[in-house]
């Protein structure tokens, strides 16, 4: 019997080189991209195309069956079913626009798709017909990122029609968050009964009074009274929390609606126990950025002080532990931060790398949501909301020959979801202040006082303050810009108070803020409960048994513009946190149940 060959050993090949059974499976990472690129070239040049697709208005596209079948179950079924279309050289598709078909084909041959507000819904519809969920998801993501009070209802109705869960949920969340703005839009009146109920029957509705919910239902009803009257009892029963309404308001409800209320749930109950809406729990708080727990080294925290109740909460700290960010609370109570720097691991490093981060705070989840980055990295920029847009102004960077102040200004358009460069300031500024009043932006630093008109993209100069200083504090109060404290040219700290009458273009000296410089105070100016307040960090050094001990107190002072004086109205729990020299304060309405309670 012949001996069997030992297959485990390599045997010579015809060219004498031993072979091995060990497979060497390699992959060219550029192979797929190369094929896609060649297919696109053949599509553009009309080479080897084997099907013509005709869409609305007679527009035709010559393409490849295998490419269409690869991205779309719709086309794969059409070309492999054995029916008439599988052998035809030309197929006609009704209900697809030429632009949408062009975008789908561009995606098929390049994996890229260009979305705009004008094409996104038509493309979503086409992708739904062709069963291409990857395009639908990209369209949904685009629509989510472009939600605003004007389009959110339309997007929600659109998502409901096509059954896209994420788009429907996110648009509904937005509607609840911006409820009072959204209900003023005409599209709100187009909601079906079930869609209206799905929005209103929620604890997360951002209303401070239940009466707003009732009024929105009546407005919706009055748009089509004859068809919608039959639905009122069900809507009232599922959506109105009558125990949260004022008795005097209920007593004034017209008989027509009172009867519907009785049909829905009997007489409105005055008993307690009804869950409050999210907006009813909101409390105006002072937020301190660049603070640190005393027992956690230098790890940053963001305490939120509820002056009315004395409670202290903690906001989610900025991502990447960002410091010296620009901070803005918009008129819609959205909190934004931009720029800043990430702390160095080296204690001696002072030349921090500027960042271009841009984040928005999500109240309901207590987390920061990433937004499009600034065009220019910047530390200590000022954020201002004006004419429906946001502006990032000035700041500093550490580049090239060292520290440089910035002239540059950029503008964020929430509808376009992008930043764009606008006219730079005539002078570079850091440690400056920027405020808005009647569609103009005002920027102050030392001997410079500038104004900016967004409509004209123009900067101009105004009368400078009587005591020029930097690192001061500015806020608009009763049609005047108050500028408080700061550092003069000789590096001396002062607590001067000046008010600029915007209409008269005139500065007026006020009484200085009474402050003992021995306590090394650091001040922040905020508009809290519609009044000017100063948040003061004071440091006191004492000697006990030849040992120096440092203690800090944080106090709040309120300004009486009639008497032109400051009164201490609150002293914070000093054991909870420490504030760095560069701490910043902002005021916003926050929701206690969404925050971590500290005290």
Swiss-Prot record:
Residues 49-117 form the BTB domain. The keyword Repeat applies. It is found in: Cytoplasm, Cytoskeleton, Spindle; Golgi apparatus. The keyword Metal-binding does not apply. Residues 152-254 form the BACK domain. Gene3D superfamilies: 1.25.40.420, Kelch-type beta propeller, Potassium Channel Kv1.1, Chain A. Signal peptide: none annotated. GO terms for cellular component: Cul3-RING ubiquitin ligase complex; Golgi apparatus; spindle. Component of the BCR(KBTBD8) E3 ubiquitin ligase complex, at least composed of CUL3, KBTBD8 and RBX1. This is Kelch repeat and BTB domain-containing protein 8. The lineage of its organism: Eukaryota, Metazoa, Chordata, Craniata, Vertebrata.
């Amino acid at each position: 019997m012949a001996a069997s060959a030992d297959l485990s050993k390599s045997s010579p090949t015809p060219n004498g080189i031993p072979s091995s059974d060990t497979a060497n499976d390699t992959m060219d990472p550029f192979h797929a991209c190369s094929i896609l690129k060649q297919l696109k070239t053949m599509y553009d040049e009309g080479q080897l195309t084997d099907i013509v697709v005709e869409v609305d208005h007679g527009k035709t596209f010559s393409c490849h069956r295998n490419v269409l079948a690869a991205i779309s179950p719709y086309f794969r079924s059409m070309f492999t079913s054995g029916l008439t279309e599988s052998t035809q050289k030309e197929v006609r598709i009704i209900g697809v626009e030429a632009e949408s078909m062009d975008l789908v084909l561009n995606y098929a041959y390049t994996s890229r798709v260009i979305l705009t507000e004008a094409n996104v819904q038509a493309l979503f519809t086409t992708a739904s017909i062709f069963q291409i969920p990857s395009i639908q998801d990209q369209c949904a993501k685009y629509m989510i990122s472009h939600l605003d009070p004007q389009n959110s209802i339309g997007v929600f109705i659109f998502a409901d029609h096509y059954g896209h869960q994420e788009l429907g949920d996110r648009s509904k969340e937005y509607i609840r968050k911006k409820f009072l703005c959204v209900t003023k839009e005409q599209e709100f009146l187009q909601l079906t009964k079930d869609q209206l109920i799905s929005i209103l029957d929620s604890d997360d509705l951002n209303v401070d009074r239940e009466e707003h919910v009732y009024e929105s239902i009546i407005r919706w009803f009055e748009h089509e009274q004859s068809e919608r009257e039959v639905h009122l009892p069900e809507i009232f029963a599922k959506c109105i929390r009558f125990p949260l309404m004022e008795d005097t308001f209920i007593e004034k409800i017209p008989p027509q609606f009172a009867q519907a209320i009785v049909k829905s749930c009997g007489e409105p109950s005055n008993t307690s126990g009804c869950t409050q809406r999210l907006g009813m729990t909101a409390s105006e708080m002072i937020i301190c950025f660049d603070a640190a727990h005393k027992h956690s080294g230098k790890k940053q925290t963001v305490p939120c002080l509820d002056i009315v109740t004395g409670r202290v909460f903690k906001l989610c700290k900025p991502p990447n532990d960002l410091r010296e960010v620009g901070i803005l609370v918009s008129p819609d109570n959205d909190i934004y931060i931009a720029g800043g720097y990430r702390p160095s691991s080296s204690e001696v490093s002072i030349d921090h790398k500027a960042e271009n981060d841009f984040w928005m705070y999500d109240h309901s989840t207590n987390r920061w949501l990433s937004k499009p980055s600034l065009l220019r990295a910047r530390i200590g920029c000022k954020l201002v909301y004006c004419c429906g847009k946001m502006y990032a102004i000035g700041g500093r960077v550490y580049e090239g020959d060292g520290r440089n102040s910035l002239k540059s200004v950029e503008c964020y358009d929430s509808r376009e979801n992008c930043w764009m460069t606008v006219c730079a300031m005539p002078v570079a500024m850091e440690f400056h202040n920027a405020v808005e009043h009647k569609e103009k932006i005002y920027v102050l630093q030392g001997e410079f006082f500038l104004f900016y008109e967004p409509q004209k993209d123009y900067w101009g100069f105004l009368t400078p303050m009587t005591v020029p200083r930097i690192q001061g504090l500015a806020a608009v109060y009763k049609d005047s810009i108050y500028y408080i404290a700061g550092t003069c040219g000789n590096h001396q700290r002062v607590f001067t108070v000046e008010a600029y009458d915007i209409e008269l273009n005139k500065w007026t000296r006020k009484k200085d803020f009474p402050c003992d410089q021995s306590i090394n105070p650091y001040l922040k100016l905020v508009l809290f409960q519609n009044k000017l307040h100063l948040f003061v960090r004071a440091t006191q050094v004492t000697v006990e048994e030849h040992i120096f001990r440092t203690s800090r107190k944080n106090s709040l002072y309120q300004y009486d513009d009639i008497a032109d004086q400051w009164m201490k109205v609150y002293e914070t729990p000093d054991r909870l946190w420490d504030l760095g020299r560069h701490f910043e304060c902002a005021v916003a309405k926050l929701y206690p149940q969404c925050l971590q309670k500290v005290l």
